[in-house]
Amino acid sequence: MKKIKLFLILILIPLFCFAQERTFYFARHGQRGDLRCRVTFKNCTEDSLMPKGILQAEALGNYMKKTGFSGTVYVSPYYRTLETASIAAKSFYTKNLILEPRCQEVTGLKSATKSVSITKKCLTKKEIKQNFPNVEIPKKMKFPWRLENEKESLADERISSLIDDLLLNTEGDILIVCHGGIINSVVREMNKRGADFPRQKNYNCCLYSFTFDSATSKIIKFADETSNFMPKDLYTDNLTEF
């Protein structure tokens, strides 16, 4: 009996230790920008993914499957991010994607001179559900949702709020499919929390990971995982190819 107890302890200890970590992944959407790859809606015209963008999203999904990801996927409400997340999810994810407006793109950057505002030039709730039926829209989410004239500092604040909320009110690993501009806010915020992530170009479907100690909410490791799955011929920054 003692041997059985010892055996169980030896098995459960590493499992318990592993459970004390959780990883937040942030991915940019796939390649977009070709005027031929656009979709017109009631209040806006949205970029859809270019052929390489679709391949990038598929590569992202295949990699997330290899990681054994079993957490929750959040996605920005833009068409290009919804499309990226939906394509990637086919490889590894069976639950609904959760819409998260706090990870939407930054529109004003440092040059914003007017007060931040909300514009109707965005997808409606009905349009999102019609085009992406696997997306869950939180009941508290307000429409319209798209911000205009937002400074980087305000974007940093909403990302900080999002990370705090997810750390406090969710469990398990997280994947957030968002945008190149807002990923800069993510990096700045994560560096405040213990990472030392370099400022660099955020390629289409880049994937950055930040692992937290669940007990302290401190970052214990971080990585750019893009090169683990992205072929060299698929490195793009929208219309710029490398």
Model segments located where?
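Conserved histidine-centered catalytic loops in small-molecule metabolism enzymes
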Residues: 70-102, 129-142, 211-242
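Short beta-strand scaffold positions
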Residues: 75-76, 157, 177-178
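Active-site-proximal alpha-helix that buttresses catalytic centers in soluble enzyme cores
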Residues: 21-100, 152
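Glycine-rich phosphate-binding loop signature in dinucleotide/nucleotide-binding domains
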Residues: 67-69, 166-173
